[in-house]
Amino acid sequence: MGPRARDLGVVIGRLGPGPHNAITDVGGVRVGHATVVRDEPSVARTGVTAIWPHQGDPWRERVYAATSILNGYGELIGIDQISEWGLLHSPVVITSSLAIGLAYDTTAR
């Protein structure tokens, strides 16, 4: 892996990184992750990451959000609402394209 932008002198934003250089340096942000690696009864290599924007109820206490399409590939549910309202009302869930429906259904429950 090559050098990070910061190592090359690139400054992004006005604030520096937090003490752990992690998304969880932001107060209230929570991150959960699960990885599945198995060979029986069938081969599975997958995972899911969920990011909660704060400790409250994201459906009632929405946060500002924006989107950016980097390469035009991938599945994204909720982009229209973020683009129209500029608000996020759920956790951000990152998973494979084939698991996005299950992630959406689980998050909506």
Predicted segments, located by residue:
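Alpha/propeptide regions of enzymes that mature by internal proteolysis
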Residues: 1-109
